[in-house]
From Swiss-Prot:
The gene is Inhbc. Glycans are attached at residues 111, 143, 161, 173. Belongs to the TGF-beta family. This is Inhibin beta C chain. It comes from Mus musculus (Mouse). Residues 1-18 form the signal peptide. CDD domains: TGF_beta_INHBC_E. Keywords: Cleavage on pair of basic residues, Disulfide bond, Glycoprotein, Growth factor, Hormone, Secreted, Signal. Homodimeric or heterodimeric through association with alpha and beta subunits, linked by one or more disulfide bonds. Inhibins are heterodimers of one alpha and one beta subunit. Activins are homo- or heterodimers of beta subunits only. GO terms for molecular function: growth factor activity; hormone activity. Its main location: secreted. It is found in: Secreted. Disulfide bonds join 240-248, 247-317, 276-349, 280-351. Gene3D superfamilies: 2.60.120.970, Cystine-knot cytokines (2.10.90.10). It comes from the Eukaryota.
Length: 352
């Protein structure tokens, strides 16, 4: 197991680059010795660093505006639906986020209600807002109808007053949840980190007859954000079993409650980080575990024989396939973010 920790440090840390042609044996073959508890602590520290790095966070978020359990449960239920088919090819992936921002009330009266939505500054770092949905709850008298204008207000550069950029008309005829798909003006505002919506009924109504619900019915905006991904090639490998010393995948589970992160990570409760460990003889160099063909094995064996006695280089057991970690969490602004963090779960290992 001494090699497993070194491999995890070498191949799961994003900033580390390993060159198989480096002189000397593979670092996995070095004789460093760690007790089991030290290995576990270092692997947990590595998992925390990897998650924070890939979420572009310097430290875990401290929740400044906690969201009530009722509002969180309701928002997730409203957004939950059938799984959408991807439009991407199998060898192309894109990093996607869904960010949920709950409303703060800036102005409320009989005639209008103004809602403020705050998004993290990371939205402006090259991310594309693909869709913005506004969801709100209305309590309305029975057998009544009301027309409501929903205005998108933005603060333009070098201006101190909000400017009306677009307006939507919604017919309200019953109590319940209403959903409105917002246009490019709202998407641009979300990208800049702040969105203001103003709700104005067309006719005068009593204050008690039109109420935007709070607590479990708190209004929110859900923004879908996308970042271009990289090409992936999936390769198969083998899992570690028994006393085998060949290159394989060792399972390792990270429990978010154990590391004290269950307050800001909503789902899942943990994830299987996994890592690669084991030996790689020269004749299996470049093979994905033992799944390569017999012809490839023979060619590599010939190359190994030709190199015998002329080199001290070794082959390393490295990840050959990874998959993303689906995460639902609170960001610095207490917004709820749903995303897939790429390359977090090692699925297969092979020899470099």
């Amino acid at each position: 197991m001494a090699s497993s920790l070194l491999l995890a440090l070498l191949f799961l840390t994003p900033t580390t680059v390993v060159n198989p042609k480096t002189e000397g044996p593979c670092p996995a073959c070095w004789g460093a010795i760690f007790d089991l508890e030290s290995q576990r602590e270092l692997l947990l520290d590595l998992a925390k660093k990897s998650i924070l790095d890939k979420l572009h966070l310097s430290q875990r978020p401290i929740l400044s505006r906690p969201v009530s359990r009722g509002a969180l449960k309701t928002a997730l239920q409203r957004l939950r639906g059938p799984r959408r088919e991807t439009l991407l090819e199998h060898d192309q992936r894109q990093e996607e986020y869904e960010i949920i921002s709950f409303a703060d009330t800036d102005l409320s009266s009989i005639n209008q209600t103004r809602l403020e939505f705050h998004f993290s500054g990371r939205m402006a770092s090259g991310m594309e807002v693909r869709q913005t949905r506004f969801m709100f709850f209305v309590q309305f008298p029975h057998n009544a109808t009301q027309t409501m204008n929903i205005r998108v207000l933005v603060l333009r550069p070098y201006d101190t007053n909000l400017t009306l950029t677009s307006q939507y008309v919604v017919q309200v005829n019953a109590s319940g949840w209403y959903q409105l798909l917002l246009g490019p003006e709202a998407q641009a505002a979300c990208s800049q980190g702040h969105l203001t919506l103003e709700l104005v009924p067309e006719s005068q109504v009593a204050h008690s007859s039109l109420i935007l619900g709070w607590f479990s019915h708190r209004p929110f905006v859900a923004a879908q954000v996308r970042v271009e991904g990289k090409h992936r090639v999936r390769r198969r490998g083998i899992d570690c079993q028994g006393a085998s010393r060949m290159c394989c995948r060792q399972e390792f589970f990270v429990d978010f409650r154990e590391i004290g992160w269950n307050d800001w990570i909503i789902q899942p409760e943990g994830y299987a980080m996994n890592f690669c460990t084991g030996q790689c003889p020269l004749h299996v160099a470049g093979m994905p575990g033992i799944s390569a063909s017999f012809h490839t094995a023979v060619l590599n064996l010939l190359k190994a024989n030709a190199a015998a006695g002329t080199t001290g280089r070794g082959s390393c057991c490295v990840p050959t396939s990874r998959r993303p970690l689906s995460l639902l969490y609170y960001d610095r602004d207490s917004n709820i973010v749903k995303t897939d963090i790429p390359d977090m779960v090692v699925e297969a290992c092979g020899c470099s």
